[in-house]
Amino acid sequence: DLNQGKRFVGMSGVSNTSALAFGGQLNPGLTANTESWDGTSWTEVANLNAAKFIGGSNGTQTSALFYGGAPGSPGVATTESWNGSSWTEVGDLNTAREGLGGAGTDNTTALGFGGNNPPQAQTEDWNGYNWVEVADLNTGRTKMASNGTVTAALAAGGTTGSNTTATEE
């Protein structure tokens, strides 16, 4: 079990033996806590620079990104990069938002898409240095399931104001 009970957590990893869980919403409050999974147990490691939740995330246990999220409305634009031992704040999203989907393989490549209330279709591409706006989702949505790489991403479900079954790749 995680060392700290929380929801709306960022996560990265490519297997059930190597993962990272970070940030999240407590009851009450937020956390900057980061925990590393070794296939058997969670170990607390270096915290995020700022507590937040419900952001986009991607990567591995040793190279991850956490971008956007909350607190605040319409969310935050900050991006934090994990190098395997610590978090560093890097270039902000062009548009602050929460509830966005994320895809990417490490802390040098990512897509952040959708998010916010009302739901947005906006998509941004992280090139390792900054975010660039690219082709939007066909259906603006927030709080969707997401996965994949920058060249093969998937967004499924979420809410457009009501729950949706829309899937885009």
Set out the residue ranges of the language-model regions.
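Polar, enzyme-active/binding microenvironments
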Residues: 1-169
